[in-house]
């Protein structure tokens, strides 16, 4: 397969090495300002406390006092906390949340992120749904 890489005799899919995660705007994407939208182009460090429920990112956006009523979330939802940090919900994540849902990952992006560990860097690439 053309997308497989041979490394030390083991075959890996290219996604193991990717650090760019495609996301689409979430329902509350319009809550964030233009400065924070530009910050989404920066690299984000994955911090500790990651598990099958969620991944946490170090470089945050502006602190905020946004609140929404408890709303449904699905795997791949990226929520913005009041401190400006982001949480990416994974396969075993909760089913509802009260933080703004600013981004949404697709299945491939969830798989790429799930292969990352503490200290790894990722970048978001915002793609529009067609």
Q: Which residue ranges define each predicted feature?
A:
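Conserved "landmark" site that anchors the functional core of diverse proteins
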Residues: 1-130
């Amino acid at each position: 397969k053309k997308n497989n890489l041979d490394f030390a005799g083991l075959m890996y899919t290219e996604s193991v090495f990717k650090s760019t995660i495609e996301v689409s705007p979430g329902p509350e994407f319009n809550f964030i300002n233009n400065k924070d939208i530009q910050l989404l182009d920066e690299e984000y460090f994955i911090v500790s406390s990651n598990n099958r429920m969620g991944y946490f990112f170090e470089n945050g956006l502006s602190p905020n006092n946004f609140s929404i009523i408890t709303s449904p979330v699905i795997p791949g939802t990226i929520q913005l906390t009041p401190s400006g940090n982001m949480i990416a919900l994974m396969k075993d994540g909760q089913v509802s949340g009260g933080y703004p849902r600013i981004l949404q990952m697709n299945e491939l992006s969830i798989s790429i992120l799930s292969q990352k560990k503490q200290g790894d860097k990722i970048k978001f690439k915002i793609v529009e749904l067609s």
